[in-house]
Regions:
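First transmembrane helix
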Residues: 8-38
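Transmembrane helix-loop junctions and nearby membrane-interface residues
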Residues: 32-35, 64-74, 110, 143-154, ...
Length: 209
């Protein structure tokens, strides 16, 4: 009975996560395809959104199948330190790029509300691509910092799950610092956006009186 329950859960998780991954790949791929196809849609904010979609696309296309291989299906050949470090690095990279991209969109929203036409005349597609480059650079640095302590001494044929757990444990002192920094920045930006919106509302109300 326990074996049947375990098999059922494995199949359920496999099908469910595969469906989510397929949905994410198709959805984000559609966003990227539309922005790439129509030149008039290649605007400053849309380029930032496209980069967010790209990070999500890679996360679903690469990291989800990898997770299914080592954690759900538990294939015997997916073992060793090298595969563990590569999979953890890719997961960290795409996750951090995703978070940084969302922060960049918050910054874009704040500047658009705060500076109006001055900001609209300043931002260009060329600057958007530079910001995208910075986002990937920041994501890469954060991923490297998280995976710095990869010097784990385990058996050669240890599973990827075991290696990743050991590497993650060694990176725990760094992870909370990085995550806390992102959370603080997001909260501050959200507060600044809210304050700017309230200020604009007061200005509009003043002119209408």
């Amino acid at each position: 009975m326990e074996v049947e329950d375990s098999l059922f859960m494995t199949i359920f998780v496999l099908v469910f996560m595969s469906f989510l991954a397929l949905f994410a790949v198709l959805g984000n791929g559609l966003v990227l395809g539309i922005i790439a196809r129509f030149k008039e849609l290649r605007t400053f904010p849309n380029i930032l959104i496209a980069n967010l979609a790209l990070a999500d696309f890679f996360n679903a296309f690469i990291n989800t199948p990898v997770y299914l291989l080592y954690a759900v299906l538990k294939v015997k050949w997916f073992t060793g330190k090298t595969l563990a470090i590569i999979s953890l690095s890719l997961l960290s990279l795409f996750t951090f790029v995703n978070v940084v991209s969302m922060l960049a969109l918050l910054v874009n929203m704040f500047l658009a509300i705060k500076f109006d036409l001055k900001y609209f005349t300043w931002k260009t597609n060329k600057k958007a691509f530079k910001i995208v480059l910075v986002e990937w650079l920041v994501g890469f640095i954060c991923a490297v910092l998280l995976c710095l302590n990869c010097d784990v001494d385990l058996q050669k044929e240890a599973s990827v799950s075991t290696y990743r757990r050991e590497v993650s444990d060694k990176g725990k002192p760094i992870a909370p610092v990085i995550i806390s920094a992102f959370v603080v920045i997001a909260v501050v930006l959200s507060a600044m956006i809210f304050r700017s919106i309230q200020k604009k509302k007061r200005q509009v109300s003043f002119f209408l009186l």
